[in-house]
């Protein structure tokens, strides 16, 4: 008999409530409810509409409970963003969006207090202005911060509203850059030196922790009272759990708005070389470390689509991939991680401005711009995997691409060509699968991440891509891309048109 679990998977563009059925050998997924997840710009900055997110989640849970006996609920989302609660447990304000510009200059401010090397040695986390650490530094002295008693990351905030429990799940907590990687607890020393109160942070719990049943009033509202689990609540952590790899020598790309590119490690790697390469050591399932690099991902193309739609031209991702496939190859390139591409805006114009500023002929039209973005992403992936191999001393035998980007056959093929490694694409729904299977693990239905990966591999089809194309051309393109990244590092790119 199949057990049913609900995975709530929150992404930067949309959220979903997914019903997972697991019979002990195979699993299946059914999307119960989907809703847009849009940021809201207020006078004080860019925010998430977290109350609407909660209401949409409740609607999805109620729908599922009418159809099935649900044995568990788990929440996953992106990292770093958080809500603040006052002493009565009330939300102080809608959470800020990590793309809000208030963190500009906060890295330098932090390094003026605690040297960069010490922060990395303590936390092992990549330096990004979006990290919770820098968001908190930017909030010091604000009325919101002054009345805050508890900080909860987005999945933990939802869990609190469902169960009343205030905890921070470990895989997501590590993204804050405030966790001591040796003790797996909040670094009280780092917090004290930065002038941030350790009392703000809730206790850390490992994935597969049962938080308890729904609050009585929530259970009455939804017509069910399933237990809630702290799963691997960082969406990439859930996705990596569900990578259907049969051997340990795989690299992964969790491909969506962000692309997270890396390997699974038993120990964190905090060498100077890892810090200078801006690799991160995020928490994984069963005590593993996700040694990876954050790459801007499909965000650039998402923003291009929004701009083109505003201009009256609607393109699906599938249409853009078809157009890009027929566009000339080995053309202009961009560094997807350049600061010019972080904030929302006219991204097509920024791509053109970047190319022009770097002495390249700017791409004209959606086909050429999409080709530029796809080739640049593939080269960035190849670069990150080459770095991961060098930093870990391990050889990678294949690349597993999971998430929405695994549907993009062109990007997968370009990744195989650029890296010279075979690519296995899928499953698309790896995050929801990992969420469901960690709940099954908590219930004792599976015993390890290896068993979970075998279940996923037996339950869902994947696609294979072998390296092809002109190897010499790709080698030259890789060298040109590497030079471009080095030269663009200190270059300011104007917004353009």
State where each predicted segment sits:
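Active-site core segments that coordinate phosphate-bearing ligands/cofactors
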Residues: 6-7, 19, 111-123, 129, ...
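Short glycine-rich phosphate-binding loop at a beta-alpha junction
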Residues: 69-77, 150, 203, 391-403
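N-terminal glycine/serine-rich phosphate-binding loop of ATP-dependent small-molecule kinases
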Residues: 1-93, 121, 203, 219-228, ...
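Glycine-rich beta-strand-to-loop/alpha-helix junction loops that act as flexible
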Residues: 76-80, 207-208, 255-258, 398-406
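A glycine-/small-polar-enriched, mobile loop at the entrance of the PLP active site in fold-type I
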Residues: 38-41, 123-132, 174-178, 199-207, ...
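Enzymes and membrane/adaptor proteins characterized by extended Gly/Ser/Thr/Asp/Glu-rich
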Residues: 164-173
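Short, basic and Ser/Thr-rich N-terminal targeting/leader segments
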Residues: 11-13, 69-71, 76-78, 132, ...
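Carbohydrate-associated surface elements
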Residues: 100
